[in-house]
A protein has these predicted regions:
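Catalytic alpha/large subunits of respiratory electron-transfer oxidoreductases
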Residues: 45, 163-545
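Fe-S ferredoxin-like electron-transfer domains
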Residues: 2-144, 149-175, 190-193, 228
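Short basic, glycine-rich beta-strand/loop surfaces that mediate nucleic-acid
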Residues: 1-2, 138, 317, 395
Length: 545
């Protein structure tokens, strides 16, 4: 109840305002809530003891909270109790007979995920949640992010693993093992068995959202083929045999020593994974350098990260992106280059789509016509469909427009950049060979589109650049990264929320694995092995002098 207003508005849809006086516990509200719950229960299966959501059902909890002890209405007449289940989705079940049409799932799909796969069809008592055009979940636009399942207060939307295994009994906080977004999850367990993965609401990267990979693609954790004990074999033709960790370590160490004795200290190396933790990667590179005595260590991130590491460190002094993921919520113009976040980084894509629905502009530079060119309630302001391999030509032609039309942020350049270096760069990009007209034949992008995109990025407010493997996994990757950094500096789009140059990593710890010294030419912290002082410091720290 709100003083000065009629009725009893819902708290979840009523904005706060200055001076508002709100009462949440009054006899009138208690009677109203009890009556509403009674009506819900009158059209709801009372199979709580055998329901998959027993003990984890908000309808059950609220019935007890409002003191509902009896239901005056029977099941006579029309009801929804005989509605069937939709089991088409491989990860969760939709039981329409338990739906209270609260609309939470619809709002989650629209406001959080941004897919708009769900709607309420029908009117009045006949209202029901529908996926797609009155079809099932599998045939609808649903991307199985799990937002609807998490939002559901009853057993209407339930994970199949919970139906099969029951409710989890303990929780472990963890990080998703897939893409570079780094979503935080609660692994909900029964003993050592994972029952479900629930996105952690306080996760800095995902803020309680998830994608199909992190939410449901964790079957490997429980799979019978997962090895939980060390095994060894004398030769490739022998059968594997399980042994203790002590025996396995001694066996591996002996074989490695034997190889070095016979073939020299450079005969052994290691490749780290960007799916490993910082601690694991650090120990591997330290073992290679301190124990094996060489720098034969590398990482799978070399393919996707090296151009970013080299380009951004040359431009800004650090190999990391300039912003966190929350920064996109303050962007006014988003320049998306060589990335398809709806497929590769879905949780970040949802945050980006939310900002775009709020009015931010989007410029896409990609050979492919990705989803974000035009999707539900979103249409890119510019789509520069370049020919593969012409990334640098496009970024230079964008810079040409900005410099020659006087759109550069001269105050930012004077205060924060190197004016001498800017003069050299601006003279280069101002040349006719870098103009949008000269580049059109090479890039395939019409000059008018380049001009319009450049003007929008330079004058549209906070401009943020996001890029993916379409930029870095390329022979011109480092040059392109530096080109984007130059564009950000020239327009003053650095040093605050909503701007920056931001790589979208391919795996969950690309940045960390490189920070830990996984490259043969760099020690932890990107300190070069050719520097005498750096080598001396690590030799003393690791006791290898």
């Amino acid at each position: 109840e709100i003083d000065g207003r009629k009725g009893t508005p819902a708290s979840c849809t009523t904005p706060c305002s200055p001076g508002m006086t709100v009462s949440t516990q009054t006899p009138k509200l208690e009677r109203l809530r009890r009556g509403v719950m009674e009506l819900y229960i009158s059209d709801h299966p009372l199979d709580c003891l055998t329901c998959a959501a027993n003990g984890d059902c908000e309808l059950q909890d609220m019935s007890g909270a409002v003191g509902l002890r009896d239901v005056r209405y029977g099941y006579e007449g029309d009801n929804h109790l005989s509605l069937g289940k939709d089991t088409s989705n491989p990860y969760f079940t939709f039981d329409s007979s338990k739906c209270i049409v609260c609309n939470r799932c619809v709002r989650a799909c629209e406001e959080i995920q941004g897919t708009f796969a769900l709607t309420i069809e029908g009117r009045g008592f006949g209202s029901r949640v529908a996926a797609g055009f009155n079809g099932n979940f599998f045939d609808s636009p649903c991307v199985s992010c799990g937002a609807c399942v998490q939002a559901c207060p009853t057993a209407t939307l339930t994970e199949n693993t919970v139906i099969e295994l029951g409710q989890p009994r303990r929780t472990v906080l963890t990080t998703c093992a897939y893409c570079g977004v780094g979503c935080s999850f609660k692994a909900e367990m029964q003993g050592e068995t994972v029952v479900r993965m629930t996105p952690y609401k306080n996760g800095g990267a995902n803020e309680g959202h998830s994608c199909v990979k992190g939410r449901f693609a964790w079957g490997y954790a429980n799979h019978q083929d997962r090895q939980l004990e060390p095994m060894i074999r004398e030769s490739i033709t022998d059968e594997w045999k399980k042994v203790s960790f002590e025996e396995a370590i001694a066996f591996a160490a002996g074989r490695l020593q034997d190889i070095q004795t016979r073939h020299g200290k450079y005969s052994i190396g290691a490749i780290t994974s960007s799916r490993c933790t910082n601690e694991e990667v650090f120990v591997v590179q330290k073992m290679v350098r301190a124990a094996f005595g060489n720098n034969n260590v590398d990482t799978c991130a070399r393919v996707c990260h090296s151009p970013t590491g080299f380009g951004l460190s040359n431009a800004f002094g650090t190999s990391a992106g300039t912003q966190d993921f929350k920064s996109v919520e303050y962007a006014d113009v988003i320049l998306l280059i060589g990335a398809n976040p709806t497929d590769a980084h879905p949780v970040f894509a949802s945050r980006m789509k939310k900002r775009l629905r709020e009015g931010a502009k989007l410029i896409i530079v990609d050979p492919r016509k990705i989803d974000l060119v035009k999707t539900a309630h979103i249409e890119a302001s510019g789509f520069l469909q370049l020919k593969p391999g012409t990334n640098v030509a496009v970024i230079n032609s964008l810079a040409h427009v900005i410099v020659t039309e006087g759109l550069a942020n001269t105050a930012f350049i004077t205060e924060r950049c190197e004016p001498t270096e800017y003069a050299i760069w601006s003279e280069f990009v101002s040349r006719h060979e870098n103009s949008q007209e000269a580049m059109e034949a090479h890039t395939g992008v019409p000059a008018a589109q380049v001009r319009e995109a450049a003007r929008l990025f330079a004058t549209g407010g906070n401009g943020a650049i996001y890029y993916g493997l379409g930029v870095t996994e390329h022979s011109q990757g480092s040059t392109m990264v530096m080109g984007m950094a130059n564009l950000a500096m020239a327009t003053g789009n650095l040093g605050r929320d909503g701007v920056g140059v931001n790589p979208l990593r391919g795996q969950n710890n690309v940045q960390g694995s490189c920070d830990m010294g996984s490259f043969p030419h760099e020690l932890p912290g990107y300190r070069h092995v050719s520097d005498d002082a750096t080598r001396t410091m690590f030799e003393q720290l690791w006791g290898t002098v």
